[in-house]
Regions:
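Terminal presequence/propeptide segments associated with secretion/organelle targeting
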Residues: 2-5, 10, 19-655
């Protein structure tokens, strides 16, 4: 979720743009539609000559840090220059929650976020016999609000540049290990010192050191942390996810993609110093809007060779991983009753699929990649034209390219085992087997039981249902076939001539690691050994895994060092004129409310409830656009012309 908001004087308002909160600035820009048509014609209607493509000043985005907003540019573009009071209000009104952004929207601690950001937490507070995801939830009294476990909200109260402190701590470090240790020690010391300086005894505080420009700059972000957060309102899934996966990550959209929680301190609703007020006025097409949010991650400042590696290896393999898991889970769901948590996991996979489809498509887009190459060429020339920079950083682009070439040699192993220890994407039995092989190796080397305690816990792990475990194990064995090759020694040793489906069934029928209980018994009885079928699966890959782990770790460490030099070179050339890549920390992005050209027509700047009801009737009640029962007969006083979603030119990404 991100927040958009207008300057004081025009009236603060909130519109649901997959929940977006906005302050607007009225302006008289060149038609945003005309601008969008220009881009559309360049890239679609005309054949692009990549030799004539030129990079733009803001190709690396407009997600600004709060301590370095481009105020002169804002004033030039919008006739509006935010002052410190405005920026402070924007910062304090925004919140970071697990994986998402929220905002204070009432003087009594209500916070607004996206529907998908609340679904897993709604599942956590669901009671026996309930299905809050399907039915929605509304707490008619504060006493009825439900505290969400594992949920928190963080308010950014202070930002400080601590680059000099970190760099000073690294001066005497000579090796990679020494630098890493010194950096972590500096982070801890700075965090403790800055947290103690702001702690007023009212709530919890923590300081996080944010690395910007790949380590060229470091900022200390100090947060007030709220840990008593309670669910107050969640629309039904049919409304909060209206249009389903089809409409997700698209526009026009009509979903009421929102949820409300309330922050408490000492058992009472928190009264924030700043909150965003509601308004019925809204914005207009062409108005400037500013997004405040915590964008998760971007890779815009990477070199062309790094982006090509993403295109061919990392992002491509993650997209395939997600797509195959979606297929597996959907096949399982067709034949079995599934829980709300299962359904939410599937929705999350579909969300990631659309995200990475877009990334992979962009990385394969000749126009986009040509602009990136032009931007890199201009950067390289700027480095070479400065004698000092050329001496220090002239070879970094070739060094990074060489590292990518070496990483490609290990790509099949990386891809085959991608996220193999992730509980969302990977079989529990595979995760137990990876831990079990390490456990047995260290046990045979004489490690003490205390040293083995963490590995024992991983071997026992947590268990999925047998059906999902089998589904995910089968999918992983199919990955082995895809990346190692059906005729490879590894695949032949693991499958023994069986299909991935047959091999998964056999492993789960005979392995002590099939579930948590049997794994615990095997450890207690000391019967777990290398002959266990699941452990044998890992043993078949052990030589390759050892080589991969050693090489991959070294290459990544080298790349991090060179990337830090790249960041220092970029900062020396451009300073804060180029914003750093997203780091799931608070940013400010500027843009305009704008319609745009698509599919030979025009997407409106706003969608309304008229469109929502139109989709329900056009596609039918059993479609992804079917409304929940209580929404089928709205009261006569309900204005169907009320905007529900909007679109703008702001630079945002997930988070």
């Amino acid at each position: 979720m991100n927040l958009l908001f207008p300057r004081a004087g025009h009236g603060p308002w909130i519109a649901l743009v997959a929940v977006i909160l906005c302050w607007t600035v009225t302006a008289s820009p060149r038609s945003a539609y005309a601008q969008s048509v220009d881009v559309y014609e360049q890239r679609v209607q005309k054949e692009v000559d990549t030799d004539t493509v030129s990079a733009g000043r803001f190709d690396d985005g407009r997600m600004w840090t709060f301590d370095h907003p481009p105020l002169d540019d804002f004033e030039s573009r919008y006739g509006f220059r935010p002052d410190e009071t405005w920026l402070r209000r924007a910062r304090l009104g925004a919140l970071r929650i697990p994986g998402c952004t929220a905002s204070f929207v009432s003087p009594r601690g209500l916070i607004l976020t996206n529907h998908h950001c609340a679904r897993s937490h709604a599942t956590d507070v669901t009671r026996d016999g309930e299905n809050l995801i399907e039915t929605g939830f509304y707490a008619e009294t504060r006493a009825a609000e439900r505290r969400a476990p594992n949920f928190f909200a963080e308010q950014l109260i202070e930002i400080a540049d601590v680059t000099a402190d970190v760099d000073a701590a690294l001066e005497d470090a000579e090796t990679d290990a020494e630098r890493q240790a010194a950096r972590q020690e500096a982070f801890a010391s700075i965090s403790d010192r800055r947290t103690a300086a702001v702690d007023d005894g009212y709530g919890a505080f923590r300081t996080e050191i944010i690395s910007l420009y790949d380590g060229a700059q470091y900022s200390a972000y100090t947060f007030r942390r709220f840990e008593d957060v309670r669910l107050a309102f969640l629309p039904e899934l049919k409304l909060g996810y209206f249009g389903g996966d089809t409409d997700n990550f698209t526009y026009p959209r009509y979903a009421l993609d929102m949820a409300l929680f309330r922050v408490y301190i000492d058992g009472e609703p928190y009264e924030p110093e700043v909150h965003f007020d509601w308004s019925t006025e809204g914005s207009r097409p062409g108005d400037a809007v500013f997004v405040v949010g915590n964008p998760g991650s971007t890779s815009r400042l990477e070199t062309v060779s790094q982006l090509e590696f993403r295109r061919d290896v990392t992002d491509a393999s993650l997209l395939r991983l997600v797509e195959t898991r979606i297929d597996a889970l959907q096949a399982y769901a067709q034949d079995n009753d599934v829980s709300p948590a299962f359904q939410d996991r599937l929705f999350s996979f579909q969300n990631v699929r659309k995200l990475y489809r877009g990334r992979v498509e962009a990385l394969n887009d000749a126009y986009i990649m040509s602009r990136i190459r032009q931007g890199e060429q201009a950067f390289r020339q700027a480095v070479q034209q400065d004698t000092s920079l050329a001496t220090s950083y002239g070879g970094i682009f070739d060094s990074i390219a060489a590292i990518q070439a070496q990483k490609r040699e290990f790509a099949p192993t990386y891809q085959a085992l991608r996220l193999s220890n992730n509980p969302v994407f990977s079989s529990a039995t595979l995760r137990r087997a990876l831990a079990a092989r390490q456990y047995l190796d260290r046990q045979s080397a004489g490690a003490s039981e205390d040293d083995l305690q963490d590995l024992r816990a991983q071997v026992v792990g947590t268990s999925r249902t047998d059906e999902i475990n089998e589904t995910l194990l089968t999918a992983r064995l199919q990955d082995f076939v895809h990346y190692f090759g059906a005729d490879s020694e590894i695949v032949q040793a693991i499958l023994g001539g069986a299909s991935p489906e047959e091999a998964a069934q056999s492993i789960l029928a005979t392995s002590a690691l099939a579930d948590s209980a049997s794994a615990a018994r095997a450890l207690a009885d000391e019967t777990l050994d290398l002959q266990d079928p699941a452990v044998a699966m890992i043993t078949a890959m052990e030589d390759r895994l050892q080589t991969f782990r050693s090489a991959w770790s070294g290459l990544n460490a080298r790349e991090a060092d060179v990337a830090a030099d790249l960041g220092r070179a970029r900062f020396a050339v451009y300073g804060h004129e180029v914003p750093p890549d997203a780091t799931f920390s608070l940013r400010l992005s500027d843009g305009r409310v704008a319609e745009y050209a698509y599919n030979g027509t025009v997407a409106p700047a706003f969608t309304t409830f008229f469109g929502l009801y139109g989709h329900h009737h056009e596609y039918g009640p059993d479609s992804e656009w079917g409304l929940p029962a209580r929404w089928l007969s709205p009261p006569s006083s309900f204005d169907l012309g009320t905007p529900v979603n909007m679109v703008s030119t702001n630079d945002i990404t997930g988070g």
